[in-house]
Amino acid sequence: MMSQLTHINASGEANMVDVSNKADTVREARAEAYVRMAPETLQLILSGQHHKGDVFATARIAGIQAAKRTWELIPLCHPLLLSKVEVQLEALPEQSSVRIESLCKLSGKTGVEMEALTAASVAALTIYDMCKAVQKDIVIENVRLLEKSGGKSGHFKVDA
């Protein structure tokens, strides 16, 4: 059975969830995204010859910044004091793509799934932004939550 939507009140109006009575627990979430591109574009990134600089370093910093600002982007997200944000980028030459994995962690009253998803998404968008001059048809795909732990709903992990 599906749970109730927590951001909708009895009148059907959107509201920020009241987490004031919840206990602080350690919460962690991992998300991923893929950026598919032409082999030549990926090679440009990997060779360090991109005219805008280090694409992976820029995407990593953008993802970290985005996680910290998720509450400003997603209307009903709480501002969180994140204790860890990690963004890893892996080139997959055989698939002509980049895999991005983010990790967010805190000790608090609400989960960090949206922060992890935002970090992976913005890192992917940054790769697109930096490479759009050489390729317009880059595809961002398969953005998803991989795992979350902590809180009332417990542990979730996607099937491999």
From Swiss-Prot:
Please indicate which superkingdom the organism of origin belongs to.
Answer: Bacteria
EC numbers for this chain: 4.6.1.17
Name of the protein described by the UniProt record: Cyclic pyranopterin monophosphate synthase
Among the Pfam families in the record, one is MoaC
CDD domains, A to Z: MoaC_PE
Query: GO molecular function terms here?
Result: cyclic pyranopterin monophosphate synthase activity; GTP 3',8'-cyclase activity
| The reaction(s) this protein catalyses | (8S)-3',8-cyclo-7,8-dihydroguanosine 5'-triphosphate = cyclic pyranopterin phosphate + diphosphate
Known function: Catalyzes the conversion of (8S)-3',8-cyclo-7,8-dihydroguanosine 5'-triphosphate to cyclic pyranopterin monophosphate (cPMP).
Instruction: Please list the GO biological process terms of this entry.
Output: Mo-molybdopterin cofactor biosynthetic process
Q: Where is the active site?
A: 129
The UniProt family comment states: Belongs to the MoaC family.
Against PANTHER family, the record matches this protein to: MOLYBDENUM COFACTOR BIOSYNTHESIS PROTEIN 1 (PTHR22960:SF0), MOLYBDOPTERIN COFACTOR SYNTHESIS PROTEIN A (PTHR22960)
- Which parts of the sequence bind substrate? 76-78, 114-115
Provide this UniProt record's keywords sorted from A to Z: Lyase, Molybdenum cofactor biosynthesis
Its pathway is: Cofactor biosynthesis; molybdopterin biosynthesis
Describe, as the record does, how this protein assembles with itself and its partners. Homohexamer; trimer of dimers.
